[in-house]
Amino acid sequence: MPGQTSAVAVLLCLAVILHGYQIREKEFPEARGYLQYTATTTEQITAKPPLPLTNQTSHATLASRSKDDYIQTAAETSTFEDTAHITMKTAIPVTTKSLLPISSTSYTFVRTNNSHMTASSTEDTIGSGSITHLPFPTTRASLAAVNHITGRSTQLGGQTTLPKALFTPSHESTTTQRPTLSTIVSELTPTGKDRSTTSSVPLVPRPTFVTWSSPAKIGTYEVLNGSRLCIKAEMGIALIVQEKGLDSATQRHFNIDPSLTHASGKCGSQNSNLFLNFQGGSVNVTFTKEENLYYVSEVGAYLTISNTEKTYQGKSTMMMFETVVGHSFKCVSEQSIQLSAQLQMKTMNIHLQAFDFEGDSFGIVDECLSDYTVVLPVVGIIVVVLCVVGLGIYKIRQRRQSSAYQRI
């Protein structure tokens, strides 16, 4: 019983206190709470602007207040100089009404001007009607220092929060224009020696000649007529320059590198062309078709030497590498073509075909006579050697047989 009596007494006391609190709320609807917030930010940046700046003056006015709220701030004029320092101190005491817990909000202010600014010691009060008409700062940021200010805002039941942007530029303030794309590119583009770090396309040197002869690399060159082959050639090409001096004539050799050569051409029903272009020169081969035969009718070339900047060119008309249409022509031995008095072209291990193709492969192979002229003497020598060896063996056997008869 005593315990129950104590509990009833406690409940009655709580009811009386709650009833009195509600009566007080009705009589005094304005319950005051105070929040004092001070944010101090110090920023110092030393930078040298890309362009000389004239002396300019900027003012900043702090704005916003709701009912009994007030905000204090101060701003002094700033002078822009060639070498800029920023020292910014801002004290923002804020007093608001609050009955609810306080929440944290982070504010970020960005400045782009390289300036020397000291903010302190003025006070301004703004009516409640101007809060919703606060203009935002027009200053835009590009590669600038950033001040991080952490503030606190309170929310009342059924009321709006204070705006996050509280700074408005005065009519006398000078703002920085928005940087254009060309300005940003010019600032980020390296100048002077830094430009050497940019990548560049390597230049292929012009032909350099040697005084000795060496086998040329075999390359495969094709010309397409739509999706079908028109010309296909596998060969090694060397250009020889003959220079006549006061005492004697010297020859300089240049082998065409297939990896540095671009093949192109023109396909026709009677004439087709193969163009081989490389740094410092080119070669042109013309194929002509007559009835069921085709052949190489013209060869031309030009070449520029890198060290002397001399250009050699020539063209020769002939009828060579003749074969049947649909067949391919092959010649392993070297073939020399005199293009001019000072320019000569040599081909080696050549295998080519023009006009009619079946698929992407060569047709029936027709070999050149020069290959036969090389092979026939070799075959003749081998036959003679075999005959001599056979005669020697025959004589040795006859001698053995004659000695055996004498013993009997």
UniProtKB/Swiss-Prot annotation:
Quick check: keyword Disulfide bond in the entry?
yes
Could you tell me which cysteines form disulfide bridges?
A: 230-267, 331-368
Ranges in the Lumenal compartment?
A: 21-373
Q: Name one GO cellular component term.
A: early endosome
UniProt KW Transmembrane keyword = yes
Return any one Pfam family short name.
Answer: Lamp2-like_luminal
> Tell me, what does this protein do in biology?
Lysosomal membrane glycoprotein which plays a role in the unfolded protein response (UPR) that contributes to protein degradation and cell survival during proteasomal dysfunction. Plays a role in the process of fusion of the lysosome with the autophagosome, thereby modulating the autophagic process. Promotes hepatocellular lipogenesis through activation of the PI3K/Akt pathway. May also play a role in dendritic cell function and in adaptive immunity.
Similarity comment text for this entry: Belongs to the LAMP family.
Protein name (database record) = Lysosome-associated membrane glycoprotein 3
